[in-house]
Regions:
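Single-residue signature of alpha-solenoid repeat helices
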Residues: 53, 91-94, 98, 135
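Flexible helix-coil transition and linker loops at the boundaries of alpha-helical arrays
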Residues: 22-29, 58-71, 88, 101-113, ...
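N-terminal leader/linker segments that initiate helical-solenoid repeat arrays
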Residues: 1-51
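Structural motif corresponding to the intra-repeat A-B loop/turn of tetratricopeptide repeats
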Residues: 47, 81, 85-88, 92, ...
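Structural register within alpha-helical repeat arrays
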Residues: 33, 40, 60, 74, ...
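N-terminal non-catalytic regions of secreted/periplasmic and cell-surface proteins
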Residues: 10-22, 28, 44, 65-66, ...
Length: 189
């Protein structure tokens, strides 16, 4: 099938799994509970101390007891970190980590509303990265699970922008058998 599905992003899945392993290997909860670590992360986020908030979210996730939506909080913290720096290397890392955390949130989600939120988050990140087809697929899958007017509106905008279109026309009228060639936005199959 020529349709792109949000879950077909193998490079993202691999990078997200590597990020999860990095968290497990590099963060030690030292007996602290998810609730305590999450509360600390939220306080640090309110203070816009993104590096420390990220560290606390990651440490909470390292407990193995964290809810799936905590991954989305981490993704949001990485996005705020991205917006708060002008360092291009850090921006690239933050952009990647935000997507990887959202992907891990999708992988960890069990309840339909958790899957929907993770798909919406992933769709927004794909959209910001100008990966419209992946964004469309993630939004579509999320909207199948939960109605969200803002996402539905963006989905319609992307769907219209990506609609099957004629992108170019070439005409060869100088030969004995004139020819026309149409270039489409997608494969015909």
């Amino acid at each position: 099938s020529g349709r792109v599905h949000a879950l077909d992003d193998v490079p993202q899945a691999i990078a997200a799994a590597q990020y999860l392993q990095l968290i497990r290997d590099g963060r030690d909860p030292a007996g602290r509970s998810v609730a305590v670590l999450r509360q600390q992360a939220e306080q640090l986020a309110q203070q816009q101390n993104w590096p420390s908030a990220i560290e606390r979210y990651e440490t909470a996730l390292a407990t193995g007891q964290a809810p799936a939506l905590l991954w989305l909080d981490l993704s949001q913290a990485w996005q705020r970190r991205l917006q708060s720096t002008t360092d291009s290397t850090l921006q690239q890392q933050a952009r990647q980590r935000a997507q990887q955390a959202a992907w891990n949130g999708l992988e960890a989600a069990r309840a339909p509303f958790e899957r929907a939120r993770a798909l919406f988050r992933l769709g927004e990140l794909y959209d910001q990265a100008k990966n419209s087809r992946q964004a469309l697929a993630a939004f579509r899958e999320g909207l199948d699970l939960e109605d969200e007017p803002r996402i539905a509106k963006r989905y319609q905008e992307l769907a219209a922008a990506l609609a099957f279109q004629i992108k170019g026309v070439e005409v060869d009228s100088d030969s004995a058998t004139p020819k026309i060639c149409l270039n489409f936005s997608d494969d015909l199959s």
